[in-house]
Swiss-Prot record:
Gene Ontology cellular component list: iron-sulfur cluster transfer complex
Entry protein name: Co-chaperone protein HscB homolog
Family: Belongs to the HscB family.
CDD domains according to UniProt: DnaJ (cd06257)
Domain of life (superkingdom): Bacteria
Ranges where the J domain occurs: 2-74
Role according to the record: Co-chaperone involved in the maturation of iron-sulfur cluster-containing proteins. Seems to help targeting proteins to be folded toward HscA.
GO biological process: [2Fe-2S] cluster assembly; protein complex oligomerization; protein folding
HAMAP family with a match to the protein in the record: HscB
Keyword entries, A-Z: Chaperone
SUPFAM superfamilies, per the entry: Chaperone J-domain, HSC20 (HSCB), C-terminal oligomerisation domain
Amino acid sequence: MNYFELFSFTPTYQIDTALLAERYRELQRAVHPDKFANASEQDKRIAVQRTAQVNDGFSTLKDPILRAEHMLSLNGIDLKHESTTVKDTLFLMQQMEWRESLEDISDSSDPDTAISDLHESFSDYAKQIAEELSGLLSSTNEAELIQAADLIRKLKFMAKLQIELERIEDALFE
């Protein structure tokens, strides 16, 4: 299913999340199963299915990584069940630096600054990737879409690091 069509969006990486939320509420009102309480069993099932599609679509489009994966899947590249890893040597070195920085936080004399610096580093890197990804995802060129897939893999890794950083932050400041 094309969630961009469901929400009346042109397939693009950058979307208006406020408009997405507005369209989500409109779709929810239109297909909510309660509206079909007196309908046939088949219509009730269809309403439940449509509600699930709307919920899945909203979750997918509001998350930048899932949105990017969805855009690739619309072009025949499925990343959901893959095991390919990032092969970019510079990124792998950066990854190791971030991991070391994460490990060093608890021993740091100023963990607040260390955490803040890592958040900033993650954010800066993710912004660079997002800008590049936006252009690549608008392409139908297979080589550019494969490049986009590599960038999505990097974003997925960074999301895991971000979760780990938040876990460390929570543990330190409980």
